Structure formats: structure tokens, C-alpha cells
Amino acid sequence: MAQAEIETLRAQAAAGEIVLAYVDEAGFSQVHPNRSAWTPTGERHLIEAKRGKRLNVLAAMISNGELFSANFWETTTAAAFSGFLSLLQEHVAGPITVILDNASIHKAKAEREFIEYLKKQGVTLYFLPPYSPELNRIERLWHKMKHTWMAPKCRDAKVLEIDIGEILSNFGSKYTFSF
């Protein structure tokens, strides 16, 4: 049912009736995640986990092909998310439907009043069914960034910011994918 509703929203966006945005947040660690390892038979498998600082990105993949994003080193909070929605609404200047998951920061009680205000400004939130990341197209961006476009290496904070910025600012030209 959600897939059919999203197809209807996509048709409305294609007709220029609404702006559609797939919104999500992702965190990027200074140390690339270790996805596999080899351990001899009979030995205990141990890998020391190092993370370093984490750069968080809130982003919207907009139906016009644009990527709108904000990066920050702090924890992603409900207030940060509400602020991002406000900036997104100002950026698109028109009715916008936001497709997003059910993360607690998206539904925080402390931000309900502000979310109601945004609704009056033309922002509609469309919450996906639980456990259906395949319906949020921006999830594909995070996967590509983490596992294809970013080389598996350790980075200091500045290099991590530069690498993330390079991808986000060149999305749609140098960095692309199709559905």
C-alpha cells in the first residue's frame, strides 16, 4: 500500500503539483567500518573497534534532482531535525511532501507544535511503514557513499568533512545512481 501511495506522490511531483523529498540522516565515522575479516580456525575472532569523531548528515533528495543537506558534528536531535525541515521548506518555497522513516527524532513530542506550524506552511510528512528502508530513496545514497564512493581509509575530521562535502556538492553530476 505504501509503495502505491508513494507512486501517486511521485506522479504529483512529476506534474508539478508538489515537491517530493526523501529525507533521512546518516552518520559517517572517521574510521571506515570493517565489513569482514579472516581468523584461523580455532582462534578467537577479535577486532579492536575504533570510531573517532562522527560527522552526521541530514539530507533531502528532492524530486527536481537536487540534494539539500546539512552536516554537523553534534548528535542529531529532534530540534536539529525540525530546523532542517524549516530550512528545506524555505529552500523549495512551495508545498512539499517529505517521505521519512519513523525515527524517534522525527516524532518527538517536544517538536510537535513546530511540526504543526510547518504543516500550515505546506509541509506534509509521509511516514513509511516500520522496517521499510527500501521505500526511502535516500537510503541508496547513504549506501553508495559508505560502500562505493568513499575509499575505505582512516580520516581525520577535516578530511572526513572534505570527502563528504565533495560527494554531497557533486551529487547529480560526478556522483549519480539510478533506480
Report the location of each language-model feature.
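Short functional hotspots at interaction and active-site rims
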Residues: 1-179
